[in-house]
Amino acid sequence: MRILEKAPAKINLSLDVTRKRPDGYHEVEMIMTTIDLADRIELTELAEDEVRVSSHNRFVPDDQRNLAYQAAKLIKDRYNVKKGVSIMITKVIPVAAGLAGGSSDAAATLRGLNRLWNLNLSAETLAELGAEIGSDVSFCVYGGTALATGRGEKIKHISTPPHCWVILAKPTIGVSTAEVYRALKLDGIEHPDVQGMIEAIEEKSFQKMCSRLGNVLESVTLDMHPEVAMIKNQMKRFGADAVLMSGSGPTVFGLVQYESKVQRIYNGLRGFCDQVYAVRMIGEQNALD
């Protein structure tokens, strides 16, 4: 038997860090939403009691470093499943980009194995399993648009944002999320208006949503990688309505209300960056049945 799952990317419309916890994690408040850029996860049941991961992308690990592998092992061991699975990952989301590609692959694996092995687990249970794998996996189980708190595992769903285009540009650099969080100084930083972003989304106001964009990690990554600032500036220059770095970076996204501007911005950025995407903000939850 074979199961197919989409694993959509996410962007952070608002990302705040409120404190560092004793366990080394940080308390966050984030507004995340899914976009129309997705990996494809193909799950095939194996008679052998093992987990295999493969991908055409050479940057995708095929062992326990892969979050989809971890997801399969976790659900298999937790529910004493004696069958195996082959996980084929067709990558569309850029790797190590701040778009939760690995987390979304893990979440899609949890959803898919729940169906493949007829486990009948609730979305809440899958999200709890996801939290054991990574901070973004719980959100990615559901998708849609949500306020994430705690270390990112506490999810409260909110309305779908106003429809718009999202231009993504990823420079050819790698950013360590752990390094960015270590370098973050909570004293004296400007915190984004998370509640204001929720209100803008509830009101379906594109202009207010643009004005409330914020990410406390952005200044840290920009100090480490000036290339990110350059892409932000170019995206603004070519006409994006609002621009922000997603997650810990290095991907920058621009919100664009009118389709007539999209091609110009996309073409302009292609001169500065190899990985450029023009997609829609979807913000709708994944099918979980």
Curated annotation (Swiss-Prot):
Pathway assigned to this chain's UniProt record: Isoprenoid biosynthesis; isopentenyl diphosphate biosynthesis via DXP pathway; isopentenyl diphosphate from 1-deoxy-D-xylulose 5-phosphate: step 3/6
Main enzyme class: transferase
EC number(s) reported in the record: 2.7.1.148
Residues that, per the record, bind ATP: P94, V95, A96, A97, G98, L99, A100, G101, G102, S103, S104
GO molecular function, one term: 4-(cytidine 5'-diphospho)-2-C-methyl-D-erythritol kinase activity
SUPFAM superfamilies assigned to the protein according to its UniProt record, in alphabetical order: GHMP Kinase, C-terminal domain, Ribosomal protein S5 domain 2-like
Active site: K10, D136
Presence of keyword ATP-binding: yes
SS bonds (residue pairs): none
GO terms of biological process kind: isopentenyl diphosphate biosynthetic process, methylerythritol 4-phosphate pathway; terpenoid biosynthetic process
Keywords (A to Z) from UniProt: ATP-binding, Isoprene biosynthesis, Kinase, Nucleotide-binding, Transferase
Pfam families: GHMP_kinases_C (PF08544), GHMP_kinases_N (PF00288)
Catalyzed chemical reaction(s): 4-CDP-2-C-methyl-D-erythritol + ATP = 4-CDP-2-C-methyl-D-erythritol 2-phosphate + ADP + H(+)
InterPro entries: GHMP_kinase_C_dom, GHMP_kinase_C_sf, GHMP_kinase_N_dom, IspE, Ribosomal_Su5_D2-typ_SF, Ribsml_uS5_D2-typ_fold_subgr
UniProt xrefs under Gene3D superfamilies: 3.30.230.10, GHMP kinase, C-terminal domain
Family: Belongs to the GHMP kinase family. IspE subfamily.
Function description: Catalyzes the phosphorylation of the position 2 hydroxy group of 4-diphosphocytidyl-2C-methyl-D-erythritol.
Protein's name according to its UniProt entry: 4-diphosphocytidyl-2-C-methyl-D-erythritol kinase
Species annotation: Bacillus subtilis (strain 168)
Top-level taxonomy: Bacteria, Bacillati, Bacillota, Bacilli, Bacillales
